[in-house]
Amino acid sequence: MKRARRAAPLPKKRRNMFAQLGIERVDYKDTSTLRQFLSERGKIRSRTVTGLTVQQQRQVTIAVKNAREMALLPYPGQG
């Protein structure tokens, strides 16, 4: 007896976090905004968690790395 196939789940619509926060460009000096994209251990959260587009995730990643370099944000495992 064959099993019934399940219908493929509908993809979730991505919410634009930058539009919700009123951000056009990510700035490494804006640590309060960047902390929203970090875990409690200081790691950068993935796109699936944050709901960002590829380009936005790259901007956040670069900004977080610059902020870490300038000692505005901690490196993972140190905070």
Curated annotation (Swiss-Prot):
Example of a GO cellular component annotation carried by this entry: cytosolic small ribosomal subunit
Domain of life: Bacteria
Pfam families: Ribosomal_S18
Alphabetical GO biological process terms: translation
InterPro entries per the UniProt record, alphabetical: Ribosomal_bS18 (IPR001648), Ribosomal_bS18_sf (IPR036870)
Matching SUPFAM superfamilies: Ribosomal protein S18
A single MF term (Gene Ontology): structural constituent of ribosome
Gene3D superfamilies: Ribosomal protein S18
Keywords, ordered alphabetically: Ribonucleoprotein, Ribosomal protein, RNA-binding, rRNA-binding
Functional description taken from the UniProt entry: Binds as a heterodimer with protein bS6 to the central domain of the 16S rRNA, where it helps stabilize the platform of the 30S subunit.
NCBIfam families referenced in this protein's UniProt entry, alphabetically: S18
Family label: Belongs to the bacterial ribosomal protein bS18 family.
Oligomeric and partner information: Part of the 30S ribosomal subunit. Forms a tight heterodimer with protein bS6.
Protein name: Small ribosomal subunit protein bS18B
Gene: rpsR2
